[in-house]
Amino acid sequence: MPTIKQLIRNTRQPIRNVTKSPALRGCPQRRGTCTRVYSTITPKKPNSALRKVARVRLTSGFEITAYIPGIGHNLQEHSVVLVRGGRVKDLPGVRYHIVRGTLDAVGVKDRQQGRSKYGVKKPK
């Protein structure tokens, strides 16, 4: 416990909270342009798959790596996408997700369950 004299000499420092998605600059989503769409990246040790990711240049000026969720996608080099926060646990350095069903990223084809997460309208 500090004395009054110590508190006068130097005040208490506020706790700085570090954001997990700095490229979004406090916004819920950001628009960006794909600079490169990687066909596949392999995950960390216990898992095995071919995950789809893309390099995206955001309107905030950051160049990030974003995960493309769902089965199949139509993204190419100059596609305009919407990016949200949210990391992929088994891909190091991937801290953002591309929002499906908005801008140039179409929804997942033939999706029946969990449709809102993949930009799919209710089937007739």
UniProtKB/Swiss-Prot annotation:
GO terms for molecular function: rRNA binding; structural constituent of ribosome. With S4 and S5 plays an important role in translational accuracy. Located at the interface of the 30S and 50S subunits. One of its GO terms (cellular component) is chloroplast. This is Small ribosomal subunit protein uS12cy. PANTHER family: 30S RIBOSOMAL PROTEIN S12 FAMILY MEMBER (PTHR11652). The gene is rps12-B. It comes from the Eukaryota. InterPro entries: NA-bd_OB-fold, Ribosomal_uS12, Ribosomal_uS12_bac. It is found in: Plastid, Chloroplast. Keywords: Chloroplast, Plastid, Ribonucleoprotein, Ribosomal protein, RNA-binding, rRNA-binding. GO terms for biological process: translation. It holds the Pfam family Ribosom_S12_S23. Part of the 30S ribosomal subunit. Belongs to the universal ribosomal protein uS12 family.
